[in-house]
Curated annotation (Swiss-Prot):
The gene is trpC. It is an enzyme of class 4 (lyase). Gene3D superfamilies: Aldolase class I. This is Indole-3-glycerol phosphate synthase. Belongs to the TrpC family. It comes from Bacillus cereus (strain B4264). CDD domains: IGPS (cd00331).
């Protein structure tokens, strides 16, 4: 029996085949916004996330324009947009809407397995592409990483365990994202940030913590581990006071 990640990647393969039939990349150059610059101080990457396989519908009918405007007003250093439709109910249209609303760095959050998805994300306004080590062979990861750089975009290389981390370090990427969620089981363990963070601190690499961050205590914990930022979706999409969450992120350690 396959994992949730296996199921998602199989769906992506079908989507990529369809994309080649209906989409022709446009060769254009545009201005981009840097996440690396934003991460010179502790940064919240605030996510637009309508749903997920683990939680079901989170905020299905969110007004993307309004949500992104609120994030920027509250002090987000970057915005992440889920573009997966099947499992997260997102779209490239959501990404494009976020770009129209915001001038801060914009992350395309998806399960990228092919260059054509990167072309589509670029055209929709992404500044940063997420590449997930668990979803790719080493060869494909290298190929897609190089292609993102060719497009003039930045990369977050996402890892969950020590083996994936070693694969990521070889690339010397702009940013490494420690995903506290195991994409095979979708279970969350914040101690992954502390475990893997030690190695990244030794390597003096820029890194962020992703998933499972809901409270001031969680923020303190990942800051102490050395994270330069956090990617937060569900907590913000269900919050009755987004500004309060951002205030909690300013806590000194």
């Amino acid at each position: 029996m396959g994992t949730i990640l296996d199921e998602i990647v199989e769906q992506k393969q079908r989507e990529v085949a369809e994309l080649y039939e209906i989409y022709t990349p446009v060769k254009t150059k545009r201005k981009t916004h840097s996440l690396v610059e934003a991460l010179q101080q502790f940064t919240v990457i605030a996510e637009v996330k309508r749903a997920s396989p683990s939680k079901g519908d989170i905020n299905l009918h969110v007004d993307v324009r309004k949500q992104v405007g609120t994030y920027e007003k509250c002090g987000a250093g970057a915005v992440s947009v889920l573009t997966d439709g099947q499992f997260f109910k997102g779209s490239f249209h959501d990404l494009q809407t976020a770009r129209e609303e915001s001038n801060i760095p914009l992350l395309c959050k998806d399960f990228i397995i092919d260059k054509i998805q990167i072309d589509r994300a670029y055209e929709a306004g992404a500044d940063i592409i997420l590449l997930i080590v668990a979803a790719l062979t080493k060869e494909k990861l290298k190929e897609l990483y190089s292609y993102v750089l060719e497009k003039g975009l930045e990369v977050i290389v996402e890892v969950h365990d020590e083996q994936e981390l070693e694969t990521a370090i070889v690339l010397n990427p702009h940013v490494i994202g420690i995903n506290n969620r195991n994409l095979k089981t979708f279970e969350v363990d914040l101690s992954q940030t502390e475990k893997l963070g030690k190695r990244l601190n030794e390597e003096k690499l820029l890194w962020i913590s992703e998933s499972g961050i809901h409270s001031k205590e969680d923020i303190i914990r990942v800051k102490r581990a050395g994270a330069k930022g956090v990617l937060v979706g569900e907590a913000l999409m269900t919050s009755s006071s987004i500004s309060s969450f951002f205030e909690d992120c300013k806590v000194n350690i």
